[in-house]
């Protein structure tokens, strides 16, 4: 039943990403909070990136990314973006980079499609074999890779996401049993960097359940618990989403917001979240008061949001309806100043399959099989440029 339901609409996996944690954002608006420091990927847990759609990662002064090449193989590249061709990440002597023996190749059903993370001088991908997903660690110079631990049983619809905190990695399946009709248990697993011991730190049982949009903020792992329902006949869907957080210190998880939260960001005592179909709220943890700052409309029913110290970026995810699974609209990134005055609408193009937001330097999207960028310093007038 699960496979049949998910296969009906090719965008269902994308819908899970859209509905359950599209992107991240920071609140620096009408308050005294200062802008957070955006660090290089060497130490940053990269919470400003979209955890569940992670085909590019910052590190070592540049960016690692995956690309579907003309020969049908997915390869891992490194680039410093401007005026530089991407370098195939393989250190094998005399490698032609044309066979599966190349250490940059992540093709076929052996690896989760296009996913790559960077943390503390290593890259991490998900390696699938014999129905099990393994955490695979790759040297950042492309000199080698190894499977370090088993994570989850996986099928072709599974999509494992990773979040990093200090010396631990947290993993979950962001598709889970979304669209299924049976009760399943979804888990967040903790992996200790070093011995790579695995333990389960959170479980949720529900029909059509998935855990999505997890991010590291301070002493907590925040995440969205979704129960996704799909009507096969009418092609309508509905996602019940609630925001939770797991306390790293005491190991206790609690519900934070009991609304339809499509995305969120935490800055100190301030929580910013987007309620599907309603808009963007700013919530104060201390006073427990909130204000609606951006009203949802037909062009932005859900939103992923990022902030770079100067501007806010709201991605409408191309979602045309909260109930019609097939309804799509033009995918647009709306750029706002700190007072939420709209200053630009950036068309992502009809071939856009992902928005990554990036860091203080670049805004990234994926168009078909290519990653494109706009320099943040040119955000008011710049156009998309394809990575070489």
Give residue ranges: language-model regions:
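Small side chains
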Residues: 11, 20-21, 62, 133, ...
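Surface-exposed loop/turn elements that mediate protein-protein interactions on large endomembrane-trafficking
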Residues: 29-48, 74-100, 131-152, 179-205, ...
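Long, acidic/polar, low-complexity amphipathic helices and coiled-coil-like
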Residues: 2, 87, 101-224
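N-terminal Sec-pathway targeting helices
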Residues: 1-16
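Repeated scaffold domains used in trafficking and secretory/extracellular systems
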Residues: 47-59, 99-117, 154-166, 206-218, ...
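Short beta-strand elements that form the blades of beta-propeller/WD-repeat-like
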Residues: 54-71, 114-128, 161-180, 218-232, ...
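Hydrophobic alpha-helical membrane-insertion segments, chiefly the h-region
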Residues: 16-27
């Amino acid at each position: 039943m699960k496979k049949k339901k998910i296969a009906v609409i090719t965008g269902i996996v994308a819908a899970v990403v859209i509905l359950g944690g599209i992107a991240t954002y920071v609140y620096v608006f009408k308050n005294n909070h200062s802008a957070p420091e955006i660090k290089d990927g060497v130490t940053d847990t990269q919470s400003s990136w979209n955890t569940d759609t992670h085909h590019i990662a910052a590190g070592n002064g540049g960016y690692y990314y995956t690309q579907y090449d003309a020969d049908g193989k997915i390869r891992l590249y490194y680039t410093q973006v401007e005026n530089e061709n991407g370098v195939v990440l393989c250190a094998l002597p005399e490698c032609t980079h044309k066979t599966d023996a190349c250490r940059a190749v992540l093709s076929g059903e052996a690896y989760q499609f296009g996913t790559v993370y960077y943390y503390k001088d290593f890259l991490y991908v998900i390696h699938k074999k014999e129905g099990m997903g393994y955490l695979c660690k790759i040297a950042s110079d492309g000199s080698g890779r190894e499977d370090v631990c088993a994570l989850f049983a996986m099928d072709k619809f599974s999509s494992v996401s990773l979040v990093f905190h200090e010396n631990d990695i947290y993993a979950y399946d962001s598709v889970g049993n979304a669209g299924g009709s049976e009760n399943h248990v979804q888990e967040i697993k903790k992996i200790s960097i070093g011995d790579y011991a695995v333990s389960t730190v959170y479980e949720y049982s529900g029909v059509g359940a998935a855990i999505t949009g997890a991010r590291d903020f301070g002493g907590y792992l925040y995440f969205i618990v979704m129960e996704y329902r799909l009507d096969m006949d009418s092609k309508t869907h509905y996602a019940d989403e609630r925001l939770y957080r797991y306390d790293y210190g005491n190991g206790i998880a609690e519900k934070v917001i009991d609304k339809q939260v499509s995305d969120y960001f935490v800055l100190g005592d301030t929580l910013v979240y987007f309620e599907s179909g309603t808009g963007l709220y700013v919530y104060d943890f201390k006073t427990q008061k909130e204000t609606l700052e951006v009203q949802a409309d037909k062009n932005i029913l859900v939103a992923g949001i990022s902030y770079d110290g100067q501007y806010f970026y709201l991605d409408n995810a191309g979602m045309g309806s909260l109930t019609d699974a097939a309804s799509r609209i033009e995918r647009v990134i709306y750029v706002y100043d700190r007072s939420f005055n709209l200053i630009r609408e950036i068309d992502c193009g009809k071939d856009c399959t992902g928005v990554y937001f990036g860091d203080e330097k670049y805004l990234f999207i994926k168009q078909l099989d290519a990653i494109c960028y706009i320099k943040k310093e040119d955000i008011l007038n710049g156009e998309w440029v394809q990575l070489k």
